């Protein structure tokens, strides 16, 4: 092979330039065989014993994964310099030889800043973040001055504010320029990840120069800290300062508009995407689909998706998630199947969305998706397992859900919350309490407000008054969670179910914040059941004051007024309902026939074959009537 190369170049003995080009091309190929051939040629030319060519050949072996050959060559290099040791250290880390790398670092006769940076980045790449930080502190004890690369690595792995402050202080003491975008962007993003918004903002304000990455980090910091309106303000300020946004910027802004249900501003951001040519980016398009969906414009989401020339997993996930958000399980499943026919491979987000969209009449389809989950190896993923359990609980298949629970390792808090709530809603209160007790024994997880809501629901459905009151009373003291509207509503419903209506009203009257109408609903229903129209009227009026656009208190008051012959008040309320365009909630049912799901609402004929069905019922009624006449005769 190399004889041909020599002839092509007209060379009898290759030059240093020839070998330099050859090594560079061989590094791109990553071929172990080619690495050996190049090494042999260097030996033949007498170059390999020089430190420079030994180092280059060492790089070649490590790049091709030939670690044994690399270590043999390392031992053969007579005059090793710091670069030789650094190349070997980096190569060992890159190929996963962690213990060898640690031993080599200890043996190094001299370490420069590159050696320390390689050690830190190597430990980080192997997942040993804490050790990486310790090495940084050791580096300081050896009085090695860190570089901007050191700080950017460290900022990406810090997990506590104290360490973050130390690294920030070291960057200042090391004289890092305020114009250094790499370091200060990394420090700002570090504070964002740690949830210290004020610190991230202070870094941004002290920077002498800012680029689009700086602004992106600021916008994301505002959004993550819950200041989404402020995040949008920063985006428009960025535009005023003529900083050109990138695709990541606009995707963030569209997502923020989605969370705020700001349709008009979201449309402006999408218009900017069109102007800047960002609509070819899947993440931007996915954010747009999600934004329209959450702003109750599902038709626009579908329209945007249908205009796509090519599908990928990000876009399909967004559309399936939109269908799931609007409880369109059939459409989500149909798109899921169609995406696979278009060679779009589902991922964990796809499965989570499509499983979450399935309703109580889609058990057979859910079982099919579960089989595919197992086949593709996603059954071990906690998020997918959570969605599987949620689907089975919704369809009433508690045993199948608990089978998923038993087989899943690495359960997170969302997983535990799902099983507690699922058991509660399927009238398995005793099992729900048992799972809750298992969670309490887990040292790494602590119940949150969702967990406690689930266990209160279990007590409510089962009528466990003592257990419910005990859990509710200990929320703040034992678990550090202040009861919210949903917790008060649940404990009040529990008391009302067992006839303790006065105790329930006492709790409602002592709520330390403005209660929602959901808190008063159980008391209202219980007072109606007991025939206490005076209390029912008082509660209904209270609900009407807090939520004037809810139809339920209107209907209750109308019923009370008609029962007590107060027709004038009843007419006034009916007029007010019409004026506010309020309607009573419609009951609905669903039925699955083969591969289709049909939805039926009360007083609605706009269903599949609705008028034909009613005509057939009329004929059957007449036929039945004729039969009765015939038999009576």
UniProtKB/Swiss-Prot annotation:
Where the protein is mainly located, per its record? Answer: mitochondrion
Any one GO BP annotation for this protein: RNA modification
Q: Transit peptide: give start and end.
A: 1-30
InterPro entries tied to this protein: Pentatricopeptide_rpt (IPR002885), PPR_At4g14850-like_plant (IPR046960), TPR-like_helical_dom_sf (IPR011990)
**Which GO molecular function terms does the record list?**
RNA binding
Any coiled-coil regions, as ranges: none
Under PANTHER family, the record lists: PENTACOTRIPEPTIDE-REPEAT REGION OF PRORP DOMAIN-CONTAINING PROTEIN, PENTATRICOPEPTIDE REPEAT-CONTAINING PROTEIN
Name the UniProt record assigns to this protein: Pentatricopeptide repeat-containing protein At1g43980, mitochondrial
């Amino acid at each position: 092979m190399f004889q041909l190369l020599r002839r092509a170049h007209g060379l009898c003995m290759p030059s240093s330039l020839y070998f330099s080009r050859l090594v560079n091309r061989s590094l791109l190929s990553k071929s172990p065989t080619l690495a050996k051939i190049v090494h042999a040629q260097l030996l033949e030319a007498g170059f390999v014993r020089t430190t420079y060519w030994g180092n280059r050949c060492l790089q070649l072996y490590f790049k091709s994964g030939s670690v044994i050959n690399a270590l043999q060559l390392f031992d053969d290099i007579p005059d090793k310099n710091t670069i030789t040791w650094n190349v070997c250290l980096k190569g060992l880390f890159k190929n996963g030889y962690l213990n060898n790398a640690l031993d080599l670092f200890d043996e190094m006769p001299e370490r420069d800043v590159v050696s320390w940076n390689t050690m830190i980045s190597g430990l980080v790449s192997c997942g040993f973040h804490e050790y990486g930080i310790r090495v940084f502190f050791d580096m300081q004890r050896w009085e090695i001055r860190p570089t901007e690369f050191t700080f950017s690595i460290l900022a990406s792995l810090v997990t506590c504010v104290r360490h973050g402050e130390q690294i920030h202080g070291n960057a200042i003491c090391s004289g890092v320029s305020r114009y250094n975008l790499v370091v200060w962007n990394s420090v700002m993003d570090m504070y964002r990840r740690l949830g210290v918004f004020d610190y991230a903002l202070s870094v941004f304000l002290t920077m002498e120069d800012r680029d689009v990455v700086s602004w992106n980090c600021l916008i994301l910091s505002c959004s993550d800290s819950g200041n989404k309106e402020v995040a949008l303000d920063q985006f428009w300020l960025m535009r005023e300062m003529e900083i050109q946004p990138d695709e990541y910027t606009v995707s963030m802004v569209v997502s923020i508009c989605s969370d705020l249900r700001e349709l008009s501003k979201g449309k402006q951001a999408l218009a900017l995407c069109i102007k800047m040519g960002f609509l070819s980016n899947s993440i931007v398009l996915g954010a747009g689909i999600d934004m329209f969906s959450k702003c109750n414009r599902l038709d626009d989401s579908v329209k945007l998706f249908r205009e796509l020339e090519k599908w990928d997993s990000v876009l399909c996930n967004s559309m399936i998630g939109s269908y799931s958000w609007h409880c369109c399980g059939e459409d989500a499943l149909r798109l899921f199947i169609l995406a696979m026919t278009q060679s779009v491979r589902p991922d964990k987000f796809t499965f989570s969305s499509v499983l979450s969209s399935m309703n109580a009449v889609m058990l057979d389809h859910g079982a099919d998706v579960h089989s595919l989950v197992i086949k593709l190896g996603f059954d071990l993923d906690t998020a997918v397992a959570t969605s599987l359990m949620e689907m089975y609980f919704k369809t009433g298949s508690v045993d199948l859900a608990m089978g998923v629970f038993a087989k899943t390792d690495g359960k997170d808090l969302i997983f535990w919350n799902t099983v507690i709530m699922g058991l509660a809603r399927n009238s398995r209160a005793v099992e729900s309490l048992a799972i809750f007790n298992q969670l309490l024994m887990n040292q790494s997880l602590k119940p949150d407000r969702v967990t406690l809501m689930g266990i209160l629901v279990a007590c409510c459905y089962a009528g466990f008054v003592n257990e419910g009151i005990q859990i509710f009373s200990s929320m703040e003291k034992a678990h550090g969670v202040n009861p919210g509207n949903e917790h008060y509503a649940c404990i009040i419903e529990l008391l009302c179910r067992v006839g303790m209506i006065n105790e329930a009203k006492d709790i409602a009257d002592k709520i330390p914040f403005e209660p929602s109408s959901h808190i008063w609903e159980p008391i209202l229903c219980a007072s109606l059941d007991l025939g206490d129209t005076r209390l029912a009227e008082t509660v209904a009026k209270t609900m009407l004051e807090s939520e004037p656009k809810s139809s339920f208190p209107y209907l209750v008051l109308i019923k009370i007024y008609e029962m007590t012959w107060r027709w004038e008040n009843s007419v006034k309320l009916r007029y007010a309902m019409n004026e506010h365009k309020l309607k009573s909630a419609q009951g609905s049912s669903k039925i699955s026939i083969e591969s289709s799901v049909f939805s039926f609402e009360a007083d609605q004929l706009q269903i599949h074959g609705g008028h034909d069905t009613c005509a057939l019922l009329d004929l059957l009624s007449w036929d039945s009537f004729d039969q009765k006449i015939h038999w009576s005769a």
